[in-house]
């Protein structure tokens, strides 16, 4: 009798849980408390590290990471909050919007690094008319993606508050993610083209032949360095500078993991709020949380501030397909070639602040809208 009773209770438990979570915004799934608290701690540590790196190295790329870190912490706070109440819309929106938008800022920072690398290796390796074109095109694309996603999230929030359908907001959100995925796919093609040029094409140029063979790998970077831009040879050749030597690999890992994560998020939203992906947390853990953690830890270790020697070396982004020092010396060119730390550091700061002006402004407006949304909902409840 006891065994029969236990078996009956055991078979009823899943049904009771499903009934209890029938109003779950996660399709019946309850976010794992331990995992989400762990992620809050991990992202809190990463956020602190990047604040310290910004203060110590004064490399402005950390601003992009800091925005990502804030959004990730808020997103996992939302998931932790949802554990105790899976029907709470405030917690769900905090999780969904913050975690979905967070990678936009990391990618904005990464786009800027390709322009830097083209400056280090030489303008002739740029497929676009100018190194800055990479930053301009893809950061603008990120801004569009961020704005569209923010509008979609806002429409969803308003629809929930009014008790109307969130279909329009969902479609707008999906469009924003689709723009981001398409932009990243194009960037990946340009990134691998750049890697092909600096690792394969230069070796072909060095041996004056075009064999497709693993023997090319036997040619060291030192042997072909004369084919790169001479001005920054000290960044490339110093033996102990392992951070720079593996920096391109780190960028590749970061972009591929974030791209994987964005494809997952797009598929999740397309399938729907009660679809298979959103109702099975392991997909989120592996394809979202783990991917973002790998990308951020990788770029924390191989931080651009270390790879490019932080504030001790400035790499101004200059226009054109030709390295500035090869042009006839005019006043404008002399300004570009002036490598005094104070002057070039100011240029570096201004360049990055200009490129991140609109993403940061949008980030502030977005956080303000989230705060206003939650505030208005609480007032309505009262």
Swiss-Prot record:
Pfam families annotated for this entry? RTA1 (PF04479)
Chief site of localization:
membrane
Which of the residues are on side Extracellular? 1-34, 79-90, 157-171, 263-281
Q: Which InterPro entries match?
A: RTA1
Q: Which domain of life is it from?
A: Eukaryota
Bilayer disposition of the protein: Multi-pass membrane protein
Q: Which residues form a coiled coil?
A: none
Residues modified by glycosylation: 3, 6
BP-aspect Gene Ontology terms: lipid transport
Any idea what job this protein has? Catalyzes the ATP-dependent translocation of sphingoid long-chain bases (LCBs) from the cytoplasmic site toward the extracytoplasmic side of the membrane (flip-flop). Involved in the establishment of the functional lipid asymmetry of the plasma membrane. Regulates intracellular levels of LCBs, sphingolipid precursors that are growth inhibitory at increased levels.
The family classification in the record reads: Belongs to the lipid-translocating exporter (LTE) (TC 9.A.26.1) family.
Name this protein carries in UniProt: Sphingoid long-chain base transporter RSB1
Q: What is the lineage of its organism?
A: Eukaryota, Fungi, Dikarya, Ascomycota, Saccharomycotina
Q: Which gene encodes it?
A: RSB1
């Amino acid at each position: 009798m006891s065994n029969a009773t236990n078996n009956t209770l055991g078979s009823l438990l899943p049904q009771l849980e499903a009934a209890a979570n029938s109003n779950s915004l996660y399709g019946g799934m309850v976010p794992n408390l331990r995992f989400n608290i762990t992620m809050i701690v991990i992202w809190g540590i990463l956020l602190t590290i990047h604040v310290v790196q910004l203060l110590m190295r004064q490399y402005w790329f950390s601003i992009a990471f800091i925005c990502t870190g804030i959004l990730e912490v808020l997103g996992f706070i939302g998931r932790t909050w949802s554990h105790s109440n899976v029907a709470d819309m405030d917690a769900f929106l905090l999780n969904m919007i913050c975690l979905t938008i967070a990678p936009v800022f990391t990618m904005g920072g990464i786009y800027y690094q390709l322009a830097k690398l083209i400056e280090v290796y030489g303008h002739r390796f740029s497929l676009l008319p100018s190194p800055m074109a990479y930053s301009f095109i893809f950061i603008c694309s990120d801004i569009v993606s961020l704005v569209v996603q923010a509008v979609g999230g806002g429409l969803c929030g308003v629809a929930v508050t009014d008790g109307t359908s969130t279909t329009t907001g969902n479609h707008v959100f999906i469009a924003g993610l689709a723009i981001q995925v398409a932009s990243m796919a194009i960037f990946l093609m340009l990134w691998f083209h750049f890697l092909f040029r600096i690792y394969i094409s230069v070796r072909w140029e060095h041996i004056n032949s075009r064999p497709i063979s693993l023997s090319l790998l036997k040619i060291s970077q030192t042997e072909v360095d004369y084919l790169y831009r001479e001005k920054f040879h000290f960044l490339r050749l110093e033996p102990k500078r392992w951070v720079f030597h593996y920096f391109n690999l780190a960028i590749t890992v970061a972009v591929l993991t974030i791209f994987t994560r964005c494809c997952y998020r797009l598929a999740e939203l397309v399938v729907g709020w009660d679809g298979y992906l959103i109702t099975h947390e392991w997909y989120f853990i592996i394809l979202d949380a783990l991917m973002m953690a790998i990308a951020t830890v990788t770029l924390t270790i191989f931080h651009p501030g270390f790879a490019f020697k932080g504030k001790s070396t400035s790499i101004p982004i200059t226009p054109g397909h030709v390295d500035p020092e090869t042009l006839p010396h005019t006043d404008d060119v002399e300004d570009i070639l002036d490598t005094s730390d104070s002057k070039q550091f100011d240029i570096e700061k201004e360049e990055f602040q200009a490129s991140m002006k609109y993403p940061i402004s949008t980030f502030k407006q977005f956080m303000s809208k989230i705060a206003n949304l939650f505030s208005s909902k609480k007032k309505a409840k009262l």
